């Protein structure tokens, strides 16, 4: 009761407040009824619609904020919203036909156009190291007749090997140069922002890139396959640099990355990363985070090239196919969200034929996506 005996006015609670959402439920109901006058609309339909729209908006804003942060901007713009949608697979499928005003476009450069610009026809030519020049033999120096059959056999083997390399490489790729003399680039893919991914058959300790990635554990263990190779090439100086980094950095957390100088190696830096173990909680998400942290460190150093082994598929137990898919997804996602990366070339340094086949196959799918 009021002071004069009248009834106290009751504040009207909106449908949105009753449902616990911010978006206007009443307006949603009007929109639904406007388009479907013949049908009965349930009470929960506009509430559910408002809740879904509210969730999608919050998700897009969070991803757009991350894109703005990566670009070192203090304000979210339509461009960042476009990048947020493009960076998320589900949102990209949902909003595929939606145009975001003032958002710009994501360039989609076909490999054929890039190939024409370079003066080639867009076909892959696997680079095979030419054999050393043979010395001219005098007429008196002739091989015995009995050894001719062996020579033919060797020629057949070399031809067969070259054919296998050509088949392994994807047909719509182009190759330009190698990370080091004497190594074979089996396949190359160009991302839409110009970065190149190359599958290389070589020894990672001999790769001439700005940085090589060393999968390790919490204590910077260098006894793994890649660590042993780097230790043999880098020697005592490399080991001392790793020990100094361990003292300075402390334990390396899962998905973390730290950088040391590449003493005794063709690479300027070595990026040590602690990849997750297959079967652990959120192991797939953590492997993607590991790759992105390695790329972020390379960007901090303004490096132009980085060489990855097959992270996670060794002692950590990831299936090779799964590891390749996650690594390629993380790299593609990183370049989409960063936009201003100094990295121009990413090498996948592999040795066994199974890993090579998997990476060539998965890289070929990037164009389709």
UniProtKB/Swiss-Prot annotation:
Gene Ontology biological-process entries: DNA repair; epigenetic regulation of gene expression; establishment of protein localization to chromatin; heterochromatin formation; negative regulation of cell cycle G2/M phase transition; negative regulation of gene expression, epigenetic; negative regulation of protein localization to chromosome, telomeric region; negative regulation of protein serine/threonine kinase activity
Keyword Acetylation among record annotations: yes
GO molecular function annotations of the record: ADP-D-ribose binding; ADP-D-ribose modification-dependent protein binding; chromatin DNA binding; DNA binding; double-stranded methylated DNA binding; enzyme binding; nucleosomal DNA binding; poly-ADP-D-ribose modification-dependent protein binding
Domain Histone H2A: 2-117
Region (Disordered): 128-180
Mod. after translation: Monoubiquitinated at either Lys-116 or Lys-117. May also be polyubiquitinated. Ubiquitination is mediated by the CUL3/SPOP E3 complex and does not promote proteasomal degradation. Instead, it is required for enrichment in inactive X chromosome chromatin.
Residues bearing the modification N6-lactoyllysine: 7, 9
Cross-link (Glycyl lysine isopeptide (Lys-Gly) (interchain with G-Cter in ubiquitin)): 116-117
PTM sites of type N6-acetyllysine: 116, 123
PROSITE patterns per record: MACRO
Modified residues (N6,N6-dimethyllysine): 123
Basic residues bias (residue ranges): 144-160
Cited InterPro entries: Core_histone_macro-H2A, Histone-fold, Histone_H2A, Histone_H2A/H2B/H3, Histone_H2A_C, Macro_dom, Macro_dom-like, Macro_H2A
Protein name: Core histone macro-H2A.1
Species annotation: Homo sapiens
Gene from which this protein is expressed: MACROH2A1
């Amino acid at each position: 009761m009021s002071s004069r005996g009248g009834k106290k006015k009751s504040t009207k609670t909106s449908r949105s407040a009753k449902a616990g959402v911010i978006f206007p439920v009443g307006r949603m109901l009007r929109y639904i009824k406007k388009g479907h006058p013949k049908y009965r609309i349930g009470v929960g339909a506009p509430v559910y619609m408002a809740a879904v729209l509210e969730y999608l908006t919050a998700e897009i804003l969070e991803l757009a904020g991350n894109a703005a942060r990566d670009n070192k901007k203090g304000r979210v713009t339509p461009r960042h919203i476009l990048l947020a949608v493009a960076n998320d697979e589900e949102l990209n499928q949902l909003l595929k036909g939606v145009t975001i005003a003032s958002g710009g476009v994501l360039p989609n450069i076909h490999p054929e156009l890039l190939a024409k610009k370079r003066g080639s026809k867009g076909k892959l030519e696997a680079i095979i190291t030419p054999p050393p020049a043979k010395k001219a033999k005098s007429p008196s120096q002739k091989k015995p007749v009995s050894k001719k059959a062996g020579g033919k056999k060797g020629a057949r083997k070399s031809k067969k090997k070259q054919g296998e390399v050509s088949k392994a490489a994807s047909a719509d790729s182009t190759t330009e140069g190698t990370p080091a003399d004497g190594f074979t680039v089996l396949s190359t893919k160009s991302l839409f922002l110009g970065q190149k991914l190359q599958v290389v058959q070589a020894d990672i300790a001999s790769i001439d890139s700005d940085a090589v990635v060393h999968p390790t554990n919490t204590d910077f263990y260098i006894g793994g396959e890649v660590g042993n190779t780097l230790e043999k090439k880098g020697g005592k100086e490399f080991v001392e640099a790793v020990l100094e980094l361990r003292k300075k950095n402390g334990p390396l957390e899962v998905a973390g990355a730290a950088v040391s100088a590449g003493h005794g190696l063709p690479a300027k830096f070595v990026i040590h990363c602690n990849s997750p173990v297959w079967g652990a909680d959120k192991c797939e998400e953590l492997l993607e985070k590991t790759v992105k942290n390695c790329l972020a460190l390379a960007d901090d150093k303004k490096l132009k090239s980085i060489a990855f082994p097959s992270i996670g598929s060794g002692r950590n137990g990831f299936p090779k196919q799964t590891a390749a898919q996650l690594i390629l997804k993380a790299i593609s996602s990183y370049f989409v969200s960063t936009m201003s990366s100094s990295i121009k070339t990413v090498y996948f340094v592999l040795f066994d034929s199974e890993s090579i086949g998997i990476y060539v196959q998965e890289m070929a799918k990037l164009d389709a996506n």
